[in-house]
């Protein structure tokens, strides 16, 4: 699209450092967004705003402006070189779609562009800004959410299915909510606090999922915040089962144990998920369902586990049984240098005796 003289002048102005005394001029001429002046890094074609620390490339900025029905910025970013087909992805109303078509967009949304933008934002080592931006662009955007979820569904569905045994729960989640949960899982695993806080604030109706994710990813302090401060509740033994889905989840397993969850059920769950470190941790905490656990191991052909459970060498670790309250700081310090007493006993055992 050939830029107008007005958009060219704005582009020149956006490249300059403008004193705060003249911000009112920028606001009046349309170079104002998210309560701040729009500045342009022409070398990398990035829109710079305080709300987006990483900057926005023109296509991403166009998508956000389209999602917000900001006609002025849609035209401006397109004249500055953004691909209007990206804008069409986020056009949720007929007038905005008409504008995108007038500016040269194809009449069908390009699915490849949706996936390109999603993986550009959500990837290993991503930032809070990118996750928040992804949620702004694609949440409450039914077609885009549908396209993304169909592309990554095999990955995310099986991750969630492992956490929630009731498949009806999964079948009732909308594509948009599944996308939100996926983004939250990424943020939680990478400890992206700003993105985590954003999700807590804007998606409270999914709070049970935030509890599930905190249990699964061994996020003790998030779990405590959700359970104690936000008062999010679910069955205690189900919480323990979820904590046992990933190995070495000692912090969240212990938290559930202190709250009163059945440690023998945790022992059985650890075998079901084939998590041996969790199994020995449960034995350290006093689990003694050896016959049931051994039967399950044999049923699943886990013969090494069955052999381990048949040995009469195990006993609770009294040093782990001192806490009486679910204080995350005390739990963290108690387990900071944890090594399994019973796993050591197993490895030191001489089978020839």
Swiss-Prot record:
Classification via Pfam families: ASFV_360
Transmembrane segments: 206-228, 249-271
GO annotation terms (biological process): taxis
One GO cellular component term noted in the UniProt record for this chain: membrane
Signal sequence interval, chain numbering: none
Residue positions with a glycan: 172, 342
InterPro entries, alphabetized: Ankyrin_rpt, Ankyrin_rpt-contain_sf, ASFV_MGF360
SUPFAM superfamilies: Ankyrin repeat (SSF48403)
Main location per the UniProt record: host cell
Entry keyword Transmembrane helix: yes
Keywords assigned by UniProt, alphabetized: ANK repeat, Glycoprotein, Host membrane, Membrane, Transmembrane, Transmembrane helix
Residues in ANK repeats: 57-89
Function of the molecule: Plays a role in virus cell tropism, and may be required for efficient virus replication in macrophages.
Family: Belongs to the asfivirus MGF 360 family.
Name of the protein in its database record: Protein MGF 360-10L
Source organism per UniProt: African swine fever virus (isolate Warthog/Namibia/Wart80/1980)
């Amino acid at each position: 699209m050939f830029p107008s003289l007005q958009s060219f002048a704005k582009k020149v102005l956006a490249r300059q450092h403008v004193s705060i005394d003249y911000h009112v001029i920028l606001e009046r001429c349309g170079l104002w967004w998210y309560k701040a002046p729009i500045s342009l890094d022409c070398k990398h074609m990035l829109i710079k705003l305080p709300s987006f620390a990483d900057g926005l490339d023109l296509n991403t900025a166009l998508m956000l402006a389209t999602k917000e029905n900001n006609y002025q910025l849609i035209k401006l970013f397109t004249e500055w070189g953004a691909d209007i087909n990206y804008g069409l992805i986020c056009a949720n109303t007929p007038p905005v779609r008409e504008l995108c078509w007038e500016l040269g967009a194809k009449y069908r949304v390009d699915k490849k562009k949706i996936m390109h933008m999603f993986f550009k934002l959500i990837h290993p080592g991503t930032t809070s800004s990118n996750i928040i931006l992804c949620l702004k662009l694609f949440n409450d955007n039914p077609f885009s959410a549908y396209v993304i979820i169909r592309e990554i569904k095999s990955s995310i569905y099986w991750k969630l299915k492992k956490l929630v045994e009731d498949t009806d729960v999964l079948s009732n989640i909308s594509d948009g909510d599944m996308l939100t949960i996926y983004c939250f899982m990424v943020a939680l695993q990478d400890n992206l606090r700003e993105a985590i806080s954003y999700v807590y604030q804007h998606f409270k109706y999914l709070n049970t999922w935030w509890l599930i994710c905190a249990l699964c990813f061994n996020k003790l302090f998030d779990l405590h915040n959700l359970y104690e401060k936000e008062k999010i509740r679910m069955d205690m033994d189900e919480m323990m089962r979820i904590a046992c889905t990933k190995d070495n989840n000692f912090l969240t397993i212990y938290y559930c144990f202190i709250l009163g969850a059945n440690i023998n059920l945790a022992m059985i769950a650890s075998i079901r998920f084939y998590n041996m470190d969790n199994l020995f941790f449960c034995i350290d905490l006093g689990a003694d369902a050896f016959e049931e656990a051994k039967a399950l191991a044999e049923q699943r052909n886990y013969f090494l586990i069955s052999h381990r459970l048949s040995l009469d060498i195990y006993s609770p670790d009294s040093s782990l049984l001192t806490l009486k309250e679910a204080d995350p700081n005390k739990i963290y310090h108690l387990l900071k240098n944890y090594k399994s007493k019973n796993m050591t006993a197993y490895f030191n055992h001489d089978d020839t005796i």
